[in-house]
């Protein structure tokens, strides 16, 4: 198929990936037609018509370079990511993590793109894969049915999917502050989380209520398949008590403060279990329950989650919900630049490609956007080094075993190993990987 001669590039979908792709293309002097159906047609999960809306957590996760997602964010900053820049401008306290005021952040991304002289925003649903120009499809896991059918046809009609869930959000003014305490795990960063401590007796009662609570039904023909990184809390609870105690209710590093007078097990300095609440907006009036994505019926959420100390009278401004995420057979369908193997004028980006997470989705949009622009200019494709996070992630999702392919977060395990003797200390090893990654990225960019 010959390269398109159109004078613009289409970007379909203005989520994190599409917003990033549109910006990267326009930054390179190429007109963009950015299509977004929200505002004309709603999705089950989105609450606004803003671009890059965060529908699950408000966290971009760890910010340290000894964390793979922290490395990926730093690489994206060096590539002038619109998502990272606006995220930084709308940060809220989150200890060692990067969390944002979700509304302020999405509004600022929307304003920047809508006011860009080379970006034409078109509100409307796309039901066919365009063939008029180079196109980046970034319609996300909530792709409309009509377009999803066309994309699934590329899979031979056998699309993949998993279920994703969001955690409840609570009005802070309804939290009993006498029963919670402010602290970040291991006192890392500023004290940013409200911690709801549980004794063993409280935890066991909570676990029993959670595992017996009624879930909202799935369609009869759909199996329950969850992404491990966003598993409903009730599913996790049914795997066993230790799954929660080593997961979202892990008490390690969250010792009681000296002035704590609430119930505790004997003289233990650390609770048996802890539920953490994280600030969800800049005003600090909303908090989400960390790791408590759920598919329980709303009445059951209220009943069970009000068993958490401090939340006995909590008001839920949003209950947890679950939705089906579709993703592609990327190892068979896409190249390392997220370009279609069968149609070189077509790129895909975001969670539909099998990357998992806000930052990873935006990163895929950045890679796809840059390479769509380079194709437009008839320049050689830019494949980032596998020693970098932004190079290793697209390499993984396009080279994984197709038969067992599942969505993947960025992690040090997919980045090319260091040469020479293995560094035993994990922190030092990750620091060395990050140092090499940033040096290699700078070298790559300097060669362009």
From Swiss-Prot:
It is an enzyme of class 2 (transferase). It comes from the Bacteria. Its cofactor is FAD. The keyword Ubl conjugation does not apply. FAD binds at residues 13-18. It is found in: Cytoplasm. Coiled coil: none annotated. Gene3D superfamilies: FAD/NAD(P)-binding domain. GO terms for biological process: tRNA methylation; tRNA wobble uridine modification. Its EC number is 2.1.1.74. Keywords: Cytoplasm, FAD, Flavoprotein, Methyltransferase, NAD, NADP, Transferase, tRNA processing. GO terms for cellular component: cytosol. Its main location: cytoplasm. One of its GO terms (molecular function) is tRNA (uracil(54)-C5)-methyltransferase activity, 5,10-methylenetetrahydrofolate-dependent. It catalyses: uridine(54) in tRNA + (6R)-5,10-methylene-5,6,7,8-tetrahydrofolate + NADH + H(+) = 5-methyluridine(54) in tRNA + (6S)-5,6,7,8-tetrahydrofolate + NAD(+); uridine(54) in tRNA + (6R)-5,10-methylene-5,6,7,8-tetrahydrofolate + NADPH + H(+) = 5-methyluridine(54) in tRNA + (6S)-5,6,7,8-tetrahydrofolate + NADP(+). Belongs to the MnmG family. TrmFO subfamily. Catalyzes the folate-dependent formation of 5-methyl-uridine at position 54 (M-5-U54) in all tRNAs. This is Methylenetetrahydrofolate--tRNA-(uracil-5-)-methyltransferase TrmFO. The gene is trmFO.
């Amino acid at each position: 198929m010959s390269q398109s001669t159109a004078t613009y590039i289409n970007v379909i979908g203005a989520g994190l990936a599409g917003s990033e792709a549109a910006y990267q293309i326009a930054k390179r002097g190429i007109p963009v037609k950015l299509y977004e159906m929200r505002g004309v047609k709603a999705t089950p999960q989105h609450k606004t018509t803003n671009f890059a809306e965060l529908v699950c957590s408000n966290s971009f996760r760890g910010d340290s370079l000894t964390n793979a997602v922290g490395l990926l964010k730093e690489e994206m900053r060096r590539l002038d990511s619109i998502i990272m820049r606006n995220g930084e401008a709308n940060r809220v306290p989150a200890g060692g993590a990067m969390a944002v005021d979700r509304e302020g952040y999405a509004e600022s991304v929307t304003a920047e793109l809508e006011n860009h002289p080379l970006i034409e925003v078109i509100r409307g649903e796309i039901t066919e894969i365009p063939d008029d120009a180079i196109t980046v499809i970034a319609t996300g896991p909530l792709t409309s049915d009509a377009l999803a059918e066309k994309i699934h046809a590329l899979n031979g009609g056998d699309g993949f999917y998993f279920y994703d869930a969001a955690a409840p959000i609570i009005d802070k003014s309804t939290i009993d502050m006498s029963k919670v305490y402010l602290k970040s795990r291991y006192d890392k960063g500023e004290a940013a989380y409200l911690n709801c401590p549980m004794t063993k007796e409280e935890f066991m009662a909570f676990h029993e209520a959670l595992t017996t609570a009624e879930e909202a039904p799935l369609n009869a023909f759909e199996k329950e398949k969850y992404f491990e990184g966003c598993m409903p809390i009730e599913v996790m609870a049914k795997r066993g008590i230790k799954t929660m105690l080593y997961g979202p209710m892990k008490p390690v590093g969250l010792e009681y403060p000296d002035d704590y007078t609430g119930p505790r097990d004997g003289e233990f300095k650390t609770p048996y279990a802890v539920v953490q609440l994280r600030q969800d907006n800049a005003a600090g009036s909303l908090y989400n329950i960390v790791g408590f994505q759920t598919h329980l019926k709303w009445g059951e959420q209220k009943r069970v989650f009000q068993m958490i100390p401090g939340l006995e009278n909590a008001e839920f401004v949003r209950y947890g919900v679950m939705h089906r995420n579709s993703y592609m057979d990327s190892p068979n369908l896409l190249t390392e630049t997220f370009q279609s193997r069968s149609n070189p004028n077509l790129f895909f980006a975001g969670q539909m490609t099998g990357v998992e997470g806000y930052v990873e989705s935006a990163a895929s949009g950045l890679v796809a956007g840059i390479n769509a622009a380079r194709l437009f200019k008839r320049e050689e494709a830019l494949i980032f080094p596998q020693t970098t996070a932004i190079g290793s992630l697209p390499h993984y999702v396009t080279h994984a075993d197709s038969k067992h392919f599942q969505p993947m977060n960025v992690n040090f395990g997919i980045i090319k190993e260091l040469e020479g003797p293995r560094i035993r200390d994990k922190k030092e090893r990750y620091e060395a990987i990050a140092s090499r990654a940033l040096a290699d990225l700078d070298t790559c960019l300097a060669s362009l």
